[in-house]
Amino acid sequence: MGISYSVDVDPDETAKAMLRERHMSHKHSKEIAREIKGKTAGEAVDYLEAVIDGDRSVPFKSHNTGVGHRNDIEGWDAGRYPEKASEAFLDLLENGINNADHQGFEGEEMVIEHVAAHKVGESPGQKPRAFGRASPWNTPQVDVELVLRTEDDE
C-alpha cells in the first residue's frame, strides 16, 4: 500500500512530494502552506529563504492572538518568522523540484497547485517539575503534502 494524498492528480502534468511525521508546529505549517500556494517553486524557495533570514514575514491569518504587526505584509498586519517550519518546507520543495526534474519537467518553473499540512500526532515527552513531579511536554508531528503542476500557457 502506497502513500495516499488528499487530492487526485494527473501524473503526466504533476510532481508530488511529502514530509512525514516532521517535528514542527502545525499552526506555522498551515500558515506557510497558505502563503506559498499558487507560487512557482522557485518563488516559494526565495520566499522561504527570506523568511529564514528575517527579511519577509509569514502572515498569520488564523492563529494570530498576540502576534505582532509587520509592515512587509500586503493587506494584513499580524505575522511572524517561523524558521523551523520554513526550513522543513524548503526540504519539501527541494524534494518536489528534484522529483519533477527526474520526471522530465522543469521543477523550478512548476506552480504549487496543492500544499496541505496535517497534524498526525505527538511525540510524548516530560518536563521535570518541583518536588519530583513531571509535566507532559509533547512535540507535535506534522505531515505535509505538495503537488507541483506545469504552468498552462493559455
From Swiss-Prot:
UniProt cross-references to Pfam families, sorted A to Z: Ribosomal_L22 (PF00237)
Matches recorded under InterPro entries: Ribosomal_uL22, Ribosomal_uL22_euk/arc, Ribosomal_uL22_sf
Alphabetized UniProt keyword annotations: Ribonucleoprotein, Ribosomal protein, RNA-binding, rRNA-binding
One GO biological process term: cytoplasmic translation
Function: This protein binds specifically to 23S rRNA. It makes multiple contacts with different domains of the 23S rRNA in the assembled 50S subunit and ribosome.
Assembly with partners or alone: Part of the 50S ribosomal subunit.
Name by which UniProt lists this protein: Large ribosomal subunit protein uL22
